[in-house]
Amino acid sequence: MANDSEPWPWPDSLDGIVAAPLSHRVLMENDRVRVLDVVIEPGAKEPPHTHKLPGVFIVIAPTRLRYFGAAGELVREYMASTEPRWFDPEPLHAVENIDSTRYHAIRIELKDN
C-alpha cells in the first residue's frame, strides 16, 4: 500500500494461499517470514488474489505471463525475469501463464516491516 497507515482493504480470504491454492504453497513460515512456492502451469490462469506482505520474488523458471488487475483488465503481458525483485503488498490481481512451459518462482514475504 502506498500509505502504511491505511488498513489493508481486502479480506484474508483473498490471500494467495487461500484464494489461489493451486499456484501458491507455503514452504516455510515463522513469525518473521513466509516463503511461498509459486507454480503456474502452461495455459493456466490463477483466480484473483492478493499478497498483503511485501517481499522478494525470485523466478526459477520464467515464462510469458499476463497480469490482470482488480477489475479483471489486462495490465501487461511480459516475459518474467530471473532477476530477484522487490514487491510491495500486491492488491487484487491474477496471473496467466501464456507459455508452453511451467512458471515457477519463490516469494519471500516479510512479516515485520
Question: Where are these predicted regions, by residue range?
Answer:
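A short, N-terminal "cap"/entry segment at the start of jelly-roll beta-barrel domains
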Residues: 1-36, 47-48, 67-69, 75-89, ...
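Glycine- and acidic-residue-biased ligand/ion/polar-headgroup-sensing regions
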Residues: 51-71
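Conformational-control "hinges and anchors"
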Residues: 40
